[in-house]
UniProtKB/Swiss-Prot annotation:
Function: Catalyzes the last reaction in the mRNA cap formation pathway.
Documented EC number(s): 2.1.1.56
Quaternary structure and interacting proteins, as annotated: Heterodimer of a large and a small subunit.
Organism, as annotated: Fowlpox virus (strain NVSL) (FPV)
Swiss-Prot/TrEMBL catalytic activity: a 5'-end (5'-triphosphoguanosine)-ribonucleoside in mRNA + S-adenosyl-L-methionine = a 5'-end (N(7)-methyl 5'-triphosphoguanosine)-ribonucleoside in mRNA + S-adenosyl-L-homocysteine
Main subcellular localisation: virion
GO cellular component: virion component
Main EC class the enzyme belongs to: transferase
Designated name of the protein: mRNA-capping enzyme small subunit
UniProt KW keywords: Methyltransferase, mRNA capping, mRNA processing, S-adenosyl-L-methionine, Transferase, Virion
One Pfam entry name: Pox_mRNA-cap
GO MF annotation, one: mRNA 5'-cap (guanine-N7-)-methyltransferase activity
Highest rank taxon of the organism: Viruses
Amino acid sequence: MNTDRITAFIKNGISARMPFYDTLPDMDLVFGKNHLPSLEYGANYFLQLSKINDINRLSTEMLSLYTHDLNKESDISKLFEPYNIKTIKSYGRSIQADAVVVDLRPSNSLYKNEHPYYKSNNYLKENNLYICDYTMITFEIYRPIFELSTEKTCIIKVPTLFGKTIVNAVRVYCSLFRYVKLYKLSADSWLKDSAIIVCQQPHAANINKFITYIRKVTKSQTWLDSNNVNFILIHDSVERVFIEKFLSFSYKIYESLYYVHSLLYSSMTSDLQSLDNEYQKKLIKLLRG
């Protein structure tokens, strides 16, 4: 494991400009379902899962103790100056601003529910962490499109890069906007696989086509909060070159997270049974600088 490379990723952040596609992929919207992870969309899921299960098994009280002050996220605002954004809005089509900014993180916490230490993975019923959970991507990821009025920039903080659904969602955005760039900034939490999508230069015809299709399927002219659920929009695989471009970005993040999570787990299970151990010191140095 190249720790110097990982340290550089965390200290400097990572970004990737995504390709523009003039044509939207074939769409067939189904609510209440989602894609299961597949090797085609990245083997990192299966590698990461072992480490996530290890951390899931430890008590949430201990997790909070060992990650105190290491999970801060202050990344979104860092992009305002580079993109000349002075005013923002989230939801409200009648409001005008420089950008639509939507934060889809479910929580600032690392975990969903408190639980004690589990002796075995047999006790794990689900991923209790807000990390590497592909079910966190809901149809709300497309809501910013319905909030655009005069804005030319859209910024979306997504909670995970895991799975087929997020890859497909970014692919759709790459036809709705001519400029799409992915970021994992140093100011983000490097305990999580969250990231930011920045979109500019709207493609009006494709946006109108997309909105018309969604309104037809949902039988509503306005956004319905009841649609903020798991979904499948694209059933076929998107372009292989696009998948590889996305994975070249996300792999660097998961490589870094694997190292971070390894340090965290080693610290939490250290024989010293104290925060004052070599793994925790490395973790603090890496994440706090």
